[in-house]
Amino acid sequence: MEGKKEEIREHYNSIRERGRESRQRSKTINIRNANNFIKACLIRLYTKRGDSVLDLGCGKGGDLLKYERAGIGEYYGVDIAEVSINDARVRARNMKRRFKVFFRAQDSYGRHMDLGKEFDVISSQFSFHYAFSTSESLDIAQRNIARHLRPGGYFIMTVPSRDVILERYKQGRMSNDFYKIELEKMEDVPMESVREYRFTLLDSVNNCIEYFVDFTRMVDGFKRLGLSLVERKGFIDFYEDEGRRNPELSKKMGLGCLTREESEVVGIYEVVVFRKLVPESDA
């Protein structure tokens, strides 16, 4: 398993930072814009002015500007890829911001982590599925989150939907011009037991190992740690609902109608939010 984790780390270390001009020319620009709009709305919904935020799997710091616009007071970014953390530091230095920033290169999903403080919001965008590599890894990741989330605080995430992927597998729709999913399945193994797959996304991810999210197990694990599920919604529904509620932001971010193939990529994912319960004595 360590070999696979190293492969994932090296994959993200190898991805070069692309300038805004290059991103705008990408064939996946509409997909990127849709994903960024969804993340911006998710941050708006669950982040208050002055909040402290722990961003797990922060990558190159692509959400820093979203948090600046949300008016947070402190940001702590953690990622397994050292190169990504260095790029995030550069991005933070070069932007106008009013909040404090800290970064740390660490595996927060498979290694015990204690930053010595709690946060109002913990975010995991397109990365928490890596916690499902083993049962032990998931347990460690969930304990890391519970340890660092303030009572009443929110854990917000975007993850691939196992249900969507398996439904497409049954229908034989596992790729288009933008993406490709390859299941690592042996003949005698039932689909319910398959834990991982290979994912490729044009201009972004190249045949990287990803893990299925066991939703029931995740909810049960967080429940034992005092976190309850407050929202679960597929990306397409979330995108359409928030587009109606935030027409100005939608226009500002250059959103348009997604093609069928673009929608297929966006529709792989879902929004999931947990809230840490407040002890009755503190309520």
UniProtKB/Swiss-Prot annotation:
Principal subcellular localisation of the protein: nucleus
Effect of residue 79 to E: Reduces activity by 77%
CDD domains reported in the protein's UniProt record: AdoMet_MTases
Effect of residue 36 to D: Reduces activity by 96%
Outcome of substituting residue 130 to F: Reduces activity by 66%
Residue numbers marked as site, mRNA cap binding: 60, 66, 91, 129, 210, 269
Localization annotation: Nucleus
Domain of life: Eukaryota
Effect on the protein upon substituting residue 126 to L: Reduces activity by 55%
Keyword entries, A-Z: Methyltransferase, mRNA capping, mRNA processing, Nucleus, RNA-binding, S-adenosyl-L-methionine, Transferase
Effect of residue 91 to A/Q: Reduces activity by over 98%
Domain mRNA cap 0 methyltransferase intervals: 26-277
Region feature Disordered, mapped onto this chain: 1-25
Protein name listed in UniProt: mRNA cap guanine-N(7) methyltransferase
Originating species: Encephalitozoon cuniculi (strain GB-M1)
Gene: ABD1
